[in-house]
Regions:
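Outer-membrane beta-barrel "beta-signal"
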Residues: 206, 231-243
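Transmembrane beta-barrel strands of outer-membrane/channel proteins
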Residues: 31-37, 65-71, 102-106, 122, ...
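Repeated loop/turn-to-beta-strand initiation elements of outer-membrane beta-barrel proteins
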Residues: 59-65, 95-100, 132-136, 174-180, ...
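Membrane-embedded beta-strands of outer-membrane beta-barrel proteins
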Residues: 50-52, 85-89, 122, 166-168, ...
Length: 243
């Protein structure tokens, strides 16, 4: 966690300092709070999913930072207590369809039995579609992972590995009102064929104002090493602002 925070601070300082002497800088902030509640005579359950994102963009570089927290209970038992922080940057050279990226993230997850996990690495990406109302992007790269997991609920598992990280990102805006957006990952260990991670984040938003939307979101995570997965489907509000 300390490594991610330190990397955030260094890159943010470098990015904002260079902005004083180069092209204009644009900022974007987004916050989404979604959840679900179920109450019956036989039991109660609730889930709250909070996501915060911040983006700084220039002509030849973008910096993204984000954090999420998911908490859920069923009756008196905790089902989710999951947090994640991430930072990535993109560097564009010449043809903007192709760019290079770097990533660092840290997460903990009660539902996936992750005590601590750090990932860091980089790669390349290509924009197959890049328009004001539609984006389709595929990226691939290598990540180093250091993890502290819990196998079968009782067995500690501290290890590290290198992963190939493949991501497909899309965004489709219909009539400036409806927004379909998603990031979907497959991360396979290079040395262990049965060690893989699947992460899917997809949402449908309907704009009420330029800055406010109603959002339905679907999140799926699978960690094959711990044999755990979760599926979250919830709804709520998204607030966003460009400046």
């Amino acid at each position: 966690m300390k490594r991610v925070v330190l990397l955030w601070m260094v890159l943010l300082y470098a990015f904002t300092s260079s902005a004083q002497f180069s092209d204009s800088v644009h900022y974007y902030v987004k916050y989404a709070s979604t959840g679900s509640v179920n109450r019956t005579n036989d039991g109660n359950s609730f889930l709250l999913n909070n996501n915060l994102g911040f983006k700084i963009s220039k002509k030849k570089m973008t910096l993204n930072m984000g954090a999420s927290y998911v908490y859920g209970k069923q009756d008196h038992s905790i089902t989710n207590n999951d947090m994640s922080t991430a930072m990535d940057f993109n560097i564009y050279r010449g043809e903007k369809k192709v760019y290079f990226w770097g990533l660092a993230n840290y997460d903990k997850s009660y539902s996936l039995k992750i005590n601590n996990r750090f990932q860091g690495g980089g790669g390349a990406a290509y924009d197959f579609i890049k328009r004001s109302n539609a984006t389709l992007n595929v990226s691939d790269g290598i990540l180093f992972e250091n993890s502290d997991l819990m196998l079968h609920d009782t067995i500690p598992d501290v290890y590290h590995t290198f992963r190939n990280s493949l991501r497909v990102y899309y965004k489709w805006v219909i009539k400036d009102i409806i927004v379909l957006e998603g990031s979907n990952y497959v991360q396979n260990s290079i040395t262990h064929g049965n060690d893989y991670i699947i992460k899917c984040n997809n949402s449908l938003s309907v704009k009420l104002r330029s800055w406010l939307s109603i959002t339905a979101a679907m999140t799926y995570n699978k960690l094959n090493r711990t044999d755990r997965e979760n599926l979250l489907m919830n709804y709520g509000l998204t607030v966003e602002k460009f400046f």
